[in-house]
């Protein structure tokens, strides 16, 4: 089942999520629906807050250029350590459509989490997988990738989202304004 994705501007995306336990109902059904939603949206990761659930859960499926597939469920993850050099990569987000920005993140992380079978892991990830995990992890912490960009650019992006509807209205008004200018020139008003 395809679930609706919450879009930037909704305060729900800014909430820090809570942990769940084995008694959480229909976790596998939820995870399958999250994968369906992510595939439909052509994403490589999706977090629970993006679909309106304030729980510490995200999924990732990534195929690298070597055609190696990485598919993983992260329940109650905790990033223990971020280290190494800073890696700058382009990031986008299903909750912030049509915005792609260069973001600086650490190249290496150590993370503890449970999988969908409640098996506990403590793993090291680096490179692009580290970036993807940090991006999704930010969601369950109530953060967005645009929080990590240059402050002025951040303001412009936020204003852009708030003004999308206003731009549409301006477009409509511009047609009226052109009509007004023609009318004014003809009748010398």
UniProtKB/Swiss-Prot annotation:
Keyword Lipid biosynthesis recorded: no
GO biological process terms on file: co-translational protein modification; translation
Co-factor note (free text): Binds 1 Fe(2+) ion.
Enzyme class: hydrolase
Keywords of this entry: Hydrolase, Iron, Metal-binding, Protein biosynthesis
Entry annotated with the keyword Hydrolase: yes
Pfam family of the protein (one): Pep_deformylase
InterPro entries: Peptide_deformylase (IPR023635), Peptide_deformylase_sf (IPR036821)
The protein's required cofactors: Fe(2+)
Residues noted as binding Fe cation in the record, renumbered to the chain: 93, 135, 139
Gene Ontology terms, MF aspect: metal ion binding; peptide deformylase activity
UniProt EC number: 3.5.1.88
Residue numbers annotated as active site: 136
Recorded family membership: Belongs to the polypeptide deformylase family.
Protein name, UniProt field: Peptide deformylase
Protein's organism: Karelsulcia muelleri (strain GWSS)
